[in-house]
Amino acid sequence: MSRLWLTGYRSYELGVFGSQDPKLLVIKDTLKKLLIGKLENGMDWLITGGQLGVEQWAAEVGLALKPDYPELKIAMMTPFAEFGSNWNENNRGTYAQLASRVDFHQSVSEQPYHGPQQLRNYQEFMLTHTDEAVMVYDLEVEGKPKYDYEAITRFAEQHAYPLTLIDMDWLQESANEYQENSNNGSQFE
């Protein structure tokens, strides 16, 4: 069994607004290619959070891959109970719909948010229940994922825990490839 933690930027940090944003199509295509490679090398659990952005997109991509990779299991873990309750109705609905479709959905803490220790406990849980991490994160473009990056690198100093960073250069290369394939009439989902 191989378990992958996938996390990264929130949608607003990447300037992605709406499901038809060209940036989102490139990000999802990048995640799809990466996940297929991981699946073909033995990954069977995709474990992500519920944040708006990379985490929800990863769950969506994983769900789209399940027909071709029925062995894939997807877990959506959140740091605390009532996660996302302060979001607008549309975002809450998207989150609830995703949570109902994944194989496993649970909060690390059964309490509503009451402090940053819950977030640290979440990071510790994710690190000790996965075998590697992938982050859509660039060291030169800080954002909320900085805290997960720091936790992962500290953990990796003491444990064999690989981290793959999908940085802005990787995303730009993916965008160029996506555009080239679109111009050549290749089909992307």
UniProtKB/Swiss-Prot annotation:
SUPFAM superfamilies xrefs: MCP/YpsA-like
Record's signal peptide: none
InterPro entries from the UniProt entry: YspA
PANTHER family from the UniProt entry: UPF0398 PROTEIN SPR0331, UPF0398 PROTEIN YPSA
Family the entry assigns: Belongs to the UPF0398 family.
Protein name: UPF0398 protein LVIS_0849
Species the sequence originates in: Levilactobacillus brevis (strain ATCC 367 / BCRC 12310 / CIP 105137 / JCM 1170 / LMG 11437 / NCIMB 947 / NCTC 947) (Lactobacillus brevis)
